[in-house]
Design a protein with these regions (language model features):
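A short, Lys/Arg-rich alpha-helix, primarily the initiator
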Residues: 1-20, 68
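Conserved hydrophobic/aromatic packing and binding residues within compact polymer-binding modules
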Residues: 14, 28-29, 39-42
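Recognition helix of helix-turn-helix/homeodomain-like DNA-binding domains
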Residues: 33-48
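DNA major-groove recognition helix of helix-turn-helix/homeodomain DNA-binding modules
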Residues: 50-69
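Short amphipathic recognition helices of helix-turn-helix/homeodomain-type DNA-binding modules
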Residues: 68-78
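Helix-turn-helix DNA-binding elements, focusing on the entry/boundary residues of the two helices
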Residues: 14, 25, 53
């Protein structure tokens, strides 16, 4: 599934989605080929690069969690 407009809009949404997917910061980092410290950073300050946000969203979707922005930002099982 191609994501055109990233639905990742805030750091709380990222953390909630990661936990819902049953991923640790380390395992999500491994899925994205980044260090777990980068995940911790993104959970405090969301990435502004749309490509990074799309990669994160794809990794979460691959683990069964979809992000959404309407009516409010959140995450749900895909």
């Amino acid at each position: 599934m191609q994501i055109n407009t990233p639905n990742l809009v805030n750091c709380r949404q990222l953390r909630a989605a990661r936990v819902l997917a049953g991923l640790t910061q380390k395992t999500l980092g491994a899925a994205l080929n980044v260090d777990e410290r980068q995940i911790r950073f993104w959970e405090r300050r969301i990435p502004t690069n749309p490509r990074k946000a799309a990669r994160i969203e794809q990794a979460l979707l691959a683990n069964g969690v979809a992000l959404f922005t309407e009516p409010t930002a959140g995450a749900r099982f895909a």
